[in-house]
Amino acid sequence: MVKILGVIPARYASSRFPGKPLVKIGDKTMIEWTYRNASRSTALSELVVATDDTRIHEVVQGFGGNSVMTRADHISGTDRIIEVANLFSEYSIIINIQGDEPGIEPELIDGVAGLKASHPEWKMSTAAVPLIDFSHGEDPNRVKVIIDRNGKAIYFSRSLIPSQFKQTVPLYRHLGIYGYDRDFLLKYNSLPKSNLEESESLEQLRAIEAGYGIGVYLAQEAGLSVDTPADLEVVIEDFKKRKWIT
């Protein structure tokens, strides 16, 4: 049986929203909401928060979650995931779950994990949703992905892809969740940085340009993420509608 580890990277020192993981949504912190919703996934064998901040570490331990302290000098979230993968050698698949999506649906995690487990020829998996609002296609903060007939990513871009010259194919928005083969993840940083990665500022293009496959799970809808205090207010209203908070 394949053992799958879910990892939630959590930083306190966010430039746009310092202390973001510890902001309250109702009576719980955002990191607790993310952890509890992610823990509903049936695919994960274990779930852990990876942080370089003792405040986050103590909060996670306080609500009964698993947390590990990582180095503070990591350049990216992937670097933090790699450090954790080295600590948990018994897991063959690692799922990188964003810590700023408190309402994450467990089905999304299950889909990404299941796709990776069923396609060992693909070294990574991720997710996307149909891009319904055409105006979002022009937003560079909403990454787009082209997917082939087998469900594998062809390319990721901040630009609108593919061209809508004839509007014959659907548009897909990429979601920031990743599944990795553990062995591939551990050698990821040894892959040469690609020109495409630098141009788009999208780390996953390193794998694409090196010739590795990334499978794409198609989700029904995107969850709400929190990048700014304004985003937090939107999430709070959404949670009230769900009757998760009052």
Swiss-Prot record:
EC number: 2.7.7.38
Enzyme category, top tier: transferase
Coarse class of the protein's main subcellular location: cytoplasm
InterPro entries in the cross-refs: Cytidylyl_trans, KdsB, Nucleotide-diphossugar_trans
Pathway: Nucleotide-sugar biosynthesis; CMP-3-deoxy-D-manno-octulosonate biosynthesis; CMP-3-deoxy-D-manno-octulosonate from 3-deoxy-D-manno-octulosonate and CTP: step 1/1; Bacterial outer membrane biogenesis; lipopolysaccharide biosynthesis
Keywords: Cytoplasm, Lipopolysaccharide biosynthesis, Nucleotidyltransferase, Transferase
Catalytic reaction(s) noted: 3-deoxy-alpha-D-manno-oct-2-ulosonate + CTP = CMP-3-deoxy-beta-D-manno-octulosonate + diphosphate
Molecular function via GO: 3-deoxy-manno-octulosonate cytidylyltransferase activity
CC annotations in GO: cytosol
Location of this chain's protein in the cell: Cytoplasm
A Pfam family annotated for this UniProt entry: CTP_transf_3
Gene Ontology terms describing biological process: CMP-keto-3-deoxy-D-manno-octulosonic acid biosynthetic process; lipopolysaccharide biosynthetic process
Function of the molecule: Activates KDO (a required 8-carbon sugar) for incorporation into bacterial lipopolysaccharide in Gram-negative bacteria.
Assigned protein family: Belongs to the KdsB family.
The protein's name in its UniProt record: 3-deoxy-manno-octulosonate cytidylyltransferase
